[in-house]
Amino acid sequence: MNILVLGSGGREHAIIKSMSKSEKSSTIYALPGNGGTSLLAKNISGDVNDFDLIKKVVVEKNISMVFVGPEDPIVKGIYDYFKLDTELSKVKIIAPSKLAGSLEGSKDFAKNFMKKYNIPTARHKTFTAENINQADSFLESMTPPYVLKADGLAAGKGVLILQDLTEAKKELRSMIIDKKFGKSSSKVVIEEFLEGIELSCFVLTDGHSYKTLPFAKDYKKIGEGDTGLNTEEWEQYLLSHF
């Protein structure tokens, strides 16, 4: 089958590298891809959020399966776009629906989802410009470090962990009032800091059954010794000893 992988990062390169080993793959395309993917697939210039362009590529290249790497097109509803288009509805697309993508696209949505279904999570509250003074009071009720999370997507950089209360209040205003992360931080989730190891659990599902993949740990900090701001992720290890 002909496969289209959307994205331009190391994640997409790793996905294409694995797909290229399968006997089921004929030609693999990457949109837009990168230097590494060009060695394994055919790169196509374009924006992963240009759904009409993606449709054109899928039709012209006789694509049977689309794998969506980045979060942005998922949150904007690329799965729904395919399923509602008669020319694309039978193309296999590996991505969640727009509603399911809200778990990644909105931290406030995710927190409310966890509360509704009794999934353990840190103590938290969501604030906007309208109730920012209440946010100050909530911060004062907590012990450091203080965790501020932009509600929307921010390329992995929207979470701040701060030790100082005054700095936390300052950064809160920078996020909400000054739009430090654009529209993504017009709403901010303040939550309790949890000590421990962060792990990612991956599950593939078709809506009827599911298959779990190995756990992994991200190393997101940009600086040496796990310091500095978060990135989308520098590297990731599969972990068995946890």
How does the language model describe each region?
Residues 1-96:
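ATP-binding N-terminal substructure of ATP-dependent carboxylate-amine bond-forming enzymes
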Residues 57, 137-138, 171:
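CheY-like receiver
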